[in-house]
Amino acid sequence: MIKLIATDMDGTLLNAGHEITTMNQEAIKFAQANGITVVIATGRAFYEAQTPVAETDLKVPYICLNGAEVREESFNIMSTSHLNHDLVHKITTALKNNHIYYQIYTNRGIYTEDPKRDLAIYIDIAERAGQKADVAKIRNNIQKRIDNGTLKVVDNYDSIEDIPGELIMKVLAFDADLSKIDQVGQALASSPNLAVSSSSRGNLEITHSDAQKGIALSAIAHQLGIDLTDVVAIGDNLNDISMLERVGYPVAMNNATDEVKHIAKYVTETNENSGVGKAIMKILKEENNLEV
């Protein structure tokens, strides 16, 4: 019987407009009304993850930054895992030596050295996903994040570690040269204290090895007294694999990578077609004998 459901956001719960469809919302509420906990598990920082959820009346716990931060439904922080100075130095040295652009995510915001480079990257990400990039909208969103303080511009990333209370949680790297970024990712992944994954082609998400979606989801299940065989995880990309491979019911989106589809028990429809909502309703009907 399913007792816990975890869903990724980008490419999974969210459509191309970064919205949670009505069907997805209704399916989540249906699960919650039947005593099932639904968790969002994302590579996004909390303030990025909460934005599309705030446009609905959903209330859920969050696994953020691939597990580097876990928040209760009330937004209280349950756990964090950050990168120490030596690990940050190892990561940034490898990226700089290979001329790979990156951003730094902390417990207080996202840091960039070059907002213009960010704009070009976000346009490229949209186009790689088969979307028509709305340059004006992307530029406005970047400026809005700078204005509200969630995207911070610095001359040099080295200054971040000098800020009292600032903890580096994730490094997000981008490069159009897929061979190069894969090679650097494999090299960094050889460190026993680093977890390296990806949320889209051409990026690397680097966290402490303790900060993985699967580890965070396992901790939540344990806290709730739920066996992992009674858990559903839904995702589309490499940073979802750590949770998909742990649960009894791994679900891949139809737009997922082949690696994700390979370990899934069930492949649902795409994120554009409310694949999350359809998967939830199908599984709860079959596994929990609920009338849907």
PLM regions and their residue ranges:
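Active-site phosphate-binding/coordination module
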Residues: T22-K132
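Residue-level signal for inorganic ion chemistry
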Residues: A31, T42, N66, V171, ...
